[in-house]
């Protein structure tokens, strides 16, 4: 199989969008600013919150979906033993070493995962998937060609995973899907939500004609309208639910109407899958060949994301 440059690019793009979120870290987490003796940090402007909210709707679903795709690609070609060894070196050791480094910067060891939490959860998915992949029935289910009806059912499930995550996390408040802080702070709802996208990536590996269909101009136009409508409804829902919040940094301590929270969660689920499919289609249409620039971007995106936090905070502090 030739290298899929469209998916390489999209995975790297999703990872690098984390820099756009973390660029405002001093405003989102005042405790970080306090460590640099910066007090009275104002809350982020609304446009900053809008950018963070928009990117957060699709970034991690896209990342885990493509991780599932590339996982089964390697597993199918190289075998389980090679696959697990490779992922332990590339993902698990990177997570452990760099998370440890970031953890001890404040002088204490709290077993926090920092911004590398997704590597920790991805390694859990990889180990679990490697085990269940040995089951013949599971292999047959995920490797079958899916009909439009089955694909529609999968989409519905992915939409439901967001409100389901709220329920599983026993948390009918806004930031129920916030990442875990430590290795021991895993949230069942988050795992179900992200693992569902991981499995979707596996299914797409066996149904790669879907990429061509999503790249068709008429499908892209339809998806773009659906995405815009979905996000407009999400903005309106968020305004109804959280419009009275004066400082979003204290949102975890506030209570909201459970019905509005669940509606907002459904809309987030719709946005997650719609934007994910749209971005796959757009990448498939625009990125069709290799180039030196693309290789550079793909190769550097992972190490840049792993180490970017400290340089970014230092630069933010200097220009604060």
Report the location of each language-model feature.
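Alpha-helical transmembrane segments and their immediate juxtamembrane cytosolic regions
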Residues: 1-320
């Amino acid at each position: 199989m030739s290298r899929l440059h469209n998916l390489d690019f999209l995975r790297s793009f999703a990872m690098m969008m984390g820099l756009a979120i973390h660029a405002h870290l001093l405003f989102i987490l005042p405790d970080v600013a306090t460590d640099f003796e910066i007090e009275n940090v104002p809350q982020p402007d609304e446009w900053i919150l809008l950018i963070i909210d928009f990117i957060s709707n699709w970034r991690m679903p896209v990342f885990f979906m493509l991780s599932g795709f590339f996982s089964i690609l390697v597993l199918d070609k190289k075998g389980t033993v090679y696959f697990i060894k490779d992922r332990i070196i590339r993902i698990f050791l990177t997570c452990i070493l760099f998370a440890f480094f970031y953890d001890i910067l404040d002088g204490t060891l709290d077993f926090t995962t920092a911004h590398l939490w997704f590597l920790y959860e991805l390694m859990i998915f990889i180990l679990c998937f490697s085990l269940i992949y040995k089951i013949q029935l599971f292999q047959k289910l995920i490797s079958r060609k899916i009909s439009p009806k089955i694909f529609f059912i999968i989409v519905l499930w992915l939409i439901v995973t967001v409100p389901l995550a709220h329920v599983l996390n026993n948390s009918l408040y806004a930031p129920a899907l916030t990442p875990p802080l430590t290795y021991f702070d895993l949230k069942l709802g988050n795992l179900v939500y992200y693992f569902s996208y991981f499995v979707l990536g596996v299914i797409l590996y066996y149904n790669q004609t879907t990429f061509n269909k999503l790249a068709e101009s008429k499908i892209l136009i339809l998806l773009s309208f659906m995405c815009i409508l979905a996000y407009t409804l999400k903005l309106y829902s968020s305004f109804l639910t959280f419009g009275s919040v004066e400082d979003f940094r204290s949102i975890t301590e506030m209570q909201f109407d459970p019905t509005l929270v669940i509606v907002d969660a459904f809309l987030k689920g719709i946005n997650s899958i719609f934007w994910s499919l749209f971005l796959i289609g757009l990448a498939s249409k625009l990125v069709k060949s290799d180039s030196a620039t693309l290789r550079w971007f793909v190769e550097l995106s992972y190490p840049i994301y792993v180490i970017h936090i400290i340089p970014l905070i230092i630069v933010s502090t200097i220009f604060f």
